[in-house]
């Protein structure tokens, strides 16, 4: 992986049931983030394949859009994920990129902004936010697309206790919905 002769992942075979929460734990450099990036199609495995519902990921534009609509990832470092001029535009990008019409996107974005308490800074530049605010926006980026699988890489990093609890409540609610 990236010039290193060691395998980040080897012999991994995993089935996760819908409506469950799973935690992947391990030390730094153990392959957790690499695994997450493979699940979302951001990183392609050197050997083997990634299957979702028994279907291998297709590394074409269409195939990657499909998998990213189904599997959303919130990066460990929000700055690796945020790139739009304003928070509102940032949260709108993914759902519009997946083909939602502007009215549907507006409704969904406004709902997530309210749910995650982003309204006070929705018009600010994403790069000017605090670490906790950036994490909230990164979570909203994915939540607005209603993925079947939502991967949160170190979800509580840089969040205050109030927002850590809010993220946990959202994850619990999504898990209950299946």
Q: Model features per residue range: what roles?
A:
Residues 48-59, 67:
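Conserved ABC transporter NBD signature motif
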Residues 103-121:
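Conserved ABC ATPase "signature" region
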Residues 146:
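Conserved catalytic motifs of ABC-family nucleotide-binding domains
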Residues 25-27:
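The feature captures the beta-strand-to-loop junction immediately N-terminal to the Walker
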Residues 125-129, 133:
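Conserved ABC ATPase signature
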Residues 150-153:
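Catalytic Walker B motif of ABC-type/P-loop ATPase nucleotide-binding domains
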Residues 40:
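Helix-to-loop junction immediately C-terminal to a conserved catalytic motif
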């Amino acid at each position: 992986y990236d010039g290193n002769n060691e395998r980040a992942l080897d012999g991994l075979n995993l089935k996760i049931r819908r409506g469950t929460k799973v935690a992947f734990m391990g030390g730094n450099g153990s392959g957790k983030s690499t695994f997450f990036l493979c699940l979302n199609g951001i990183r392609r495995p050197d050997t083997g394949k990634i299957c979702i519902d028994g279907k291998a990921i297709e590394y074409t534009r269409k195939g990657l859009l499909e998998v990213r609509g189904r599997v959303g990832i919130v990066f460990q470092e929000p700055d690796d994920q945020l790139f739009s001029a304003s928070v509102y535009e940032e949260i709108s990008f993914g759902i519009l990129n997946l083909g939602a019409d502007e009215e549907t996107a507006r409704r969904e974005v406004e709902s997530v902004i309210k749910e995650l308490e982003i309204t006070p800074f929705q018009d600010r530049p994403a790069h000017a936010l605090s670490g906790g605010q950036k994490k909230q926006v990164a979570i909203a980026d994915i939540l607005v697309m209603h993925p079947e699988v939502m991967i949160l890489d170190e979800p509580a990093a840089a969040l205050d206790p109030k927002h850590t609890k809010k993220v946990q409540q959202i994850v619990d609610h999504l898990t209950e919905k299946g």
